[in-house]
Amino acid sequence: MSLSLWQQCLARLQDELPATEFSMWIRPLQAELSDNTLALYAPNRFVLDWVRDKYINNINGLLNDFCGSDAPVLRFEVGSKPIVPVAVSSAASSGASVPPAAVRASSLARPSWERVTAQPELSYRSNVNPKHTFDNFVEGKSNQLARAAARQVADNPGGAYNPLFLYGGTGLGKTHLLHAVGNGIMARKPNAKVVYMHSERFVQDMVKALQNNAIEEFKRYYRSVDALLIDDIQFFANKERSQEEFFHTFNALLEGNQQIILTSDRYPKEINGVEDRLKSRFGWGLTVAIEPPELETRVAILMKKADENDIRLPGEVAFFIAKRLRSNVRELEGALNRVIANANFTGRAITIDFVREALRDLLALQEKLVTIDNIQKTVAEYYKIKVADLLSKRRSRSVARPRQMAMALAKELTNHSLPEIGDAFGGRDHTTVLHACRKIEQLREESHDIKEDFSNLIRTLSS
């Protein structure tokens, strides 16, 4: 046996696992085969535990397939072996391209803050909000991968996930995670030069530097940070001079093993007005979506927010609010703040009837905006078919998949029962609706396109 055994396993895992999972959990592993033992090295304990819990059966199964009774014993360790990691093909992930070999190799260098520099020290404005941490970020299925990736970056900046690109709609927690990473890095290394900013601040700083003939100082400032966290990168669109400068800053940071984290409201390749060479680099590390929170996560967010305010929020009230406000975390928190303020002003107990009254206009607006009829029209327009097709008996994939998507959205965004949804789709049985919902949930895990379609439609219907 040789190390090619692990390369064979990688190839199979690449085919079997969703691209994001492969990039996040499998690609960072290093392998060493000796004495009939295959040692897999994980960059930290978090990755080790996750891989061992989630993928050990997959890996052992492949070892048995390739080697039969001679399959090596699998061992996991934290750390890295003193050789170049096993290379995987650029096809490893459709959403996270493999950076050039020189950049990958640089990820094994010492952290930038451990290197001695001859340059005089600069004054850094961190702008990281200490209130946003991993501890008060409510994790759910919609943001689990994003939080896990951010946690790993905080523990190992400049490592496997560089750059980390988080994308999703407004108010879903992207900014919270940026600050959480910054706080995590500075907790580990208090002297780390971590800079958080909105992309427009980068543009403003560059303009001021040009006006003051201080562009070299601008370059040195941004290229000497240990971690650069930029929010809403889509605002670079059509700003050619800013893109040019950020392109060179990006390259300098990556070559220096300094961490970059970017956020956007859309997938990198869908950002209009940004140069292709930049969009390509955005995908060199790991790209992860944050989706609108599912019902259970929305309830958990409300309960945690109430607890932080020393407010007792009955579970049925949290469920009532979460079932009706679905678009994003910011909307949920705003609604809860209004409920709490009304309760404080009036001295009344927080009940469902009280919430109905306090959020009367907001709930009425939601019910008006999201109806099954509206969902059907939006989905039909999105997939360029007719509403009549969604209600028909046609079973071709070009019609069946949009119909399943519309049913899943109706269950997610309205308060209608499964039988009511079935009736609205040509008199279908409730079991058909249930199957459609489960199918879309499965496809969202397996297909980047379906995940994007679902997120785009949620965003359209909730706006």
From Swiss-Prot:
This is Chromosomal replication initiator protein DnaA. Belongs to the DnaA family. CDD domains: AAA, Bac_DnaA_C. Residues 344-463 are annotated as: Domain IV, binds dsDNA. GO terms for cellular component: cytoplasm; plasma membrane. Plays an essential role in the initiation and regulation of chromosomal replication. ATP-DnaA binds to the origin of replication (oriC) to initiate formation of the DNA replication initiation complex once per cell cycle. Binds the DnaA box (a 9 base pair repeat at the origin) and separates the double-stranded (ds)DNA. Forms a right-handed helical filament on oriC DNA; dsDNA binds to the exterior of the filament while single-stranded (ss)DNA is stabiized in the filament's interior. One of its GO terms (biological process) is regulation of DNA replication. Residues 127-343 are annotated as: Domain III, AAA+ region. ATP binds at G171, G173, K174, T175. Residues 83-126 are annotated as: Domain II. Its main location: cytoplasm. The keyword Nucleotide-binding applies. Residues 1-83 are annotated as: Domain I, interacts with DnaA modulators. Oligomerizes as a right-handed, spiral filament on DNA at oriC. It holds the Pfam family DnaA_N. The keyword Nucleotide-binding applies. PROSITE patterns: DNAA. InterPro entries: AAA+_ATPase (IPR003593), Chromosome_initiator_DnaA (IPR001957), Chromosome_initiator_DnaA-like (IPR020591), Chromosome_initiator_DnaA_CS (IPR018312), DnaA_C (IPR013159), DnaA_dom (IPR013317), DnaA_N_dom (IPR024633), DnaA_N_sf (IPR038454). Domain I is involved in oligomerization and binding regulators, domain II is flexibile and of varying length in different bacteria, domain III forms the AAA+ region, while domain IV binds dsDNA. It comes from the Bacteria. It is found in: Cytoplasm. Keywords: ATP-binding, Cytoplasm, DNA replication, DNA-binding, Lipid-binding, Nucleotide-binding. GO terms for molecular function: ATP binding; ATP hydrolysis activity; DNA replication origin binding; lipid binding.
